[in-house]
């Protein structure tokens, strides 16, 4: 009673297809696939944009002590 057999899942699938129809299920699948693809692309773009910003911060370090020494003179 704890797990469902393949027959239970087939019956559920048939009922869902009768209630929603195949066209609506296809549209839901396409929307879900597009959302997953957009999420993956966004994650890839986020990683690419973060890497150059980190390199930029490392290369533009300002020596604060040097500015204070020149002001005192």
UniProtKB/Swiss-Prot annotation:
HAMAP family on file: TatA_E
UniProt superkingdom: Bacteria
TM region positions: 1-21
Protein's cellular compartments: Cell inner membrane
A GO term, aspect molecular function: protein transmembrane transporter activity
Annotated source species: Cupriavidus pinatubonensis (strain JMP 134 / LMG 1197)
Keyword Membrane part of the UniProt annotation: yes
Topology of this chain in the membrane: Single-pass membrane protein
Region (Disordered): 43-73
Subunit structure: The Tat system comprises two distinct complexes: a TatABC complex, containing multiple copies of TatA, TatB and TatC subunits, and a separate TatA complex, containing only TatA subunits. Substrates initially bind to the TatABC complex, which probably triggers association of the separate TatA complex to form the active translocon.
Protein's recorded name: Sec-independent protein translocase protein TatA
Signal sequence residues: none
Role, per record: Part of the twin-arginine translocation (Tat) system that transports large folded proteins containing a characteristic twin-arginine motif in their signal peptide across membranes. TatA could form the protein-conducting channel of the Tat system.
Keywords from the named record: Cell inner membrane, Cell membrane, Membrane, Protein transport, Translocation, Transmembrane, Transmembrane helix, Transport
Chief location category: membrane
Family: Belongs to the TatA/E family.
Lineage: Bacteria, Pseudomonadati, Pseudomonadota, Betaproteobacteria, Burkholderiales
